[in-house]
Amino acid sequence: MTETITFTLVKSGIGSTDKIRATLTGLGLTKLNKTVTRKDTPEIRGMLNKVKHLVRIDEA
């Protein structure tokens, strides 16, 4: 695995449950097309798995 993981919000969280919206906020994804780079940890991977239908993941 790489040291960091980059992901982008490509679909809006509007209409999603409160848990999904809280996960997006926890990942730092507040606006559409916002790109965030984080350390690649199991916790971040789990959060991304929960919102995988809303984000694009670039492992670099």
From Swiss-Prot:
Molecular functions (GO terms): structural constituent of ribosome
GO CC terms of this entry: cytosolic large ribosomal subunit
Gene name, Swiss-Prot/TrEMBL: rpmD
Family listed: Belongs to the universal ribosomal protein uL30 family.
Organism in which the protein naturally occurs: Desulfotalea psychrophila (strain LSv54 / DSM 12343)
Source organism superkingdom: Bacteria
InterPro entries membership: Ribo_uL30_ferredoxin-like_sf (IPR036919), Ribosomal_uL30_bac-type (IPR005996), Ribosomal_uL30_ferredoxin-like (IPR016082)
Keyword field: Ribonucleoprotein, Ribosomal protein
Name listed for the protein in its UniProt record: Large ribosomal subunit protein uL30
CDD domains hit by this protein: Ribosomal_L30
Subunit structure, interactors included: Part of the 50S ribosomal subunit.
GO biological process: translation
Pfam families: Ribosomal_L30 (PF00327)
